[in-house]
């Protein structure tokens, strides 16, 4: 799941020039780190034949370490959120489920902290809602 989300974000124009990895972001400017905050099952249904359908939400946090240029960084965060919404609407988001349409949201972009070394750390919250269908295997 992290691999798919990282590959998806690597296509984002707002993240060009950044080194994107799984895990926390280091102190070096132009780096980004992604990790999964967890998965929540929103709905679970089971039919008489044992087929289980789950609607899930995976939550991720993306941290970016950038030089302190407030206007440029604010625009970068907005551009990323707009791009993610457009990709999701067009059906070009990461495929996390195996049935139905998936919805991806990037939201709550904000500055987390500014460091004395002239860099700032920003966070963006990513949520992906998807459906997984499980069928009981018979022998």
Spans of features found by a protein language model:
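Charged, amphipathic alpha-helical segments and their flanking helix caps
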Residues: 1-25, 40-139
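A short, hydrophobic beta-strand-centered structural micro-motif
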Residues: 30-39
């Amino acid at each position: 799941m992290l691999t798919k989300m990282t590959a998806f974000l690597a296509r984002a124009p707002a993240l060009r020039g950044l080194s994107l990895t799984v895990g926390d972001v280091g102190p070096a400017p132009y780096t980004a780190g992604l990790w999964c905050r967890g998965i929540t099952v929103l709905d679970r249904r089971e039919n008489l034949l044992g087929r289980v359908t789950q609607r899930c939400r995976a939550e991720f946090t993306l941290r970016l370490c950038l030089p302190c240029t407030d206007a440029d960084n604010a625009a970068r965060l907005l551009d990323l959120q707009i791009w993610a919404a457009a990709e999701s609407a067009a059906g070009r988001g990461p495929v996390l489920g195996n049935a139905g349409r998936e919805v991806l949201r990037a939201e709550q972009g904000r500055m987390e902290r500014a460091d004395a070394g002239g860099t700032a750390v920003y966070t963006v919250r990513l949520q992906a809602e998807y459906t997984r269908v499980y069928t009981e295997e018979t022998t």
